[in-house]
A protein has these predicted regions:
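Conserved C-terminal alpha-helix-loop-beta "cap" of PLP-dependent enzymes
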Residues: 281-363, 367
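Glycine-rich beta-alpha junction loops
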Residues: 19-21, 34-40, 183, 205, ...
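PLP-dependent enzyme catalytic core of the Aspartate aminotransferase-like
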Residues: 115, 124, 138-141, 258, ...
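Short loop segments at secondary-structure junctions
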Residues: 37, 220-225, 252, 311-315, ...
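Short amphipathic alpha-helical segments
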Residues: 48, 74, 214, 248, ...
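Conserved PLP-enzyme active-site core in the AAT-like
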Residues: 2-6, 76-276
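Conserved N-terminal alpha-helix of the aminotransferase class I/II PLP-enzyme fold
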Residues: 37-87, 109-116
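N-terminal "arm"/small-domain region of PLP-dependent enzymes with the aminotransferase-like
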Residues: 2-57, 63-66
């Protein structure tokens, strides 16, 4: 099989990048390489560069090849979790006294990592509404930042940031521009092509896509930064295991199809909720009423599978989150099954009382690929119980 090129279609790259058949047996699906160590042809005589499982593994290499091909990057690194990927990048790019300019609507774990873990080593963090480029410009003029870090769409309020505009502002200020592309996935958005320096993923979510593997990834073009992050990955050991890498690779092969269905179902869910009298507000970039709708339509090829909704008050939100049947109350997102999350006490509990706190009346829906009619019926009965 010939490795797909950058000109190959996204779906072709998702299926074939890094997936050459096994040369020994002809197996169409590459095997999972569980070996922790590799025989050498004499001292230092490595075969294909493999020495020890922490420094490299063929199954992990296959996943990294696939990830780089999908994001259009020169390099990719696969980690044991999304936060492990973030930690390696931050440690490689920052020194004590540096500052991260962070979106004011990001995953609570990211803020916790920077503010509490790296904060103890002299790294500071400021937050700003990344959907307001004037506010970003003012923040960078007030004080320089080493990294500008954004999620778009953001978690959980689905704010949309102009990645190309943000990249220009960040680069003019000498900052590294990092985009967490977890919510959109490379099937819907290509941040590197828009000017970002690094793309971050929790591969646990849409890339894996089946709620059965935890992982993270970085995709980037800069050779020097790649070398620094790869060294830290090796030194710390936060690598994805062979089976985790293989499961993620398998999930990615259907990514384009899944994201299309997630987006279609989410659009129907958002429209239904917008018309429901018990709902105060719906956050979904696919709605024309969303402030970032036109921007999302320009820089994304679909609006994604996450819908957040505000009820009248926190008590109503809690009851709704506990009243659905198909939508399971659980952490995480991006699997084929629909999930319900109450951010204030679940995914974003670590930022309660801060400027990143999520309003307690908000519930986040990860809309799966089930029958849309069944999902709407489930939401309808849940809202009827308020």
């Amino acid at each position: 099989m010939t490795e797909p090129t950058a000109d190959s279609g996204f779906e072709t790259r998702a299926v074939h990048a890094g997936q050459a058949f096994d040369p020994t047996t002809g197996a169409v699906i590459p095997p999972v390489h569980f070996s922790t160590t590799y025989a050498q042809d004499g001292i230092g005589g490595l075969r294909e560069g493999y020495e020890y499982g922490r420094s490299g593994n063929p199954t992990r290499t296959a996943l990294e090849t696939q990830l780089a091909a999908l994001e259009g990057g020169a390099h990719a690194l696969s980690f044991a979790s999304g936060l492990a990927a973030e930690d390696a990048l931050l440690r490689a790019a920052l020194t004590p006294g540096d500052e991260v300019l962070l979106g004011n609507d990001v995953y609570g774990g990211t803020y916790r990592l920077i503010a509490r873990v790296l904060g103890a080593w002299g790294v500071s963090v400021r937050v700003v509404d990344m959907s307001d480029l004037d506010a970003v410009r003012a923040a960078l003029e007030e004080r320089p930042a080493r990294i500008v870090w954004v999620e778009t769409p953001s978690n959980p309020l689905l704010r949309i940031t102009d990645v190309a505009g943000l990249a220009r502002l960040g680069h003019d200020a000498g900052a590294l521009v990092v985009v967490d592309n977890t919510f959109a996935s490379p099937a819907l958005q290509q941040p590197l092509a828009l000017g970002a320096d690094v793309v971050v993923h929790s591969t646990t979510k849409y890339l894996g896509g089946h709620s059965d593997v935890v992982g993270g990834a970085l995709v980037l073009n800069d050779d020097a930064l790649y070398g620094e992050v790869k060294f830290l990955q090796f030194a710390v050991g936060a690598v994805s295991g062979p089976l985790d890498a293989w499961l993620t690779t398998r999930g990615i092969k259907t990514l384009a199809l899944r994201m299309q269905r997630h987006s279609e179902n989410a659009q129907q869910v958002a429209s239904f909720l917008s018309a429901h009298p018990a709902v105060a507000r719906v956050y979904y970039p696919g709605l024309p009423t969303h402030p970032g709708h036109e921007l999302a339509a320009r820089q994304m090829s679909g609006f994604g599978g996450i819908v957040s909704v505000a009820l009248d008050d926190a008590a109503s939100a809690r009851r709704f989150a506990e009243s659905t049947r198909l939508f399971q109350l659980a952490e995480s997102l991006g699997g084929v099954e629909s999930l319900m999350n109450y951010p204030d006490e679940m995914t974003h509990a670590s930022v309660r009382g801060t400027e990143l706190a999520v309003p307690p009346e908000v519930v986040r829906l990860s809309v799966g690929i089930e029958s849309a009619a069944d999902l709407l019926a489930d939401l309808d009965q849940g809202l009827a119980r308020l």
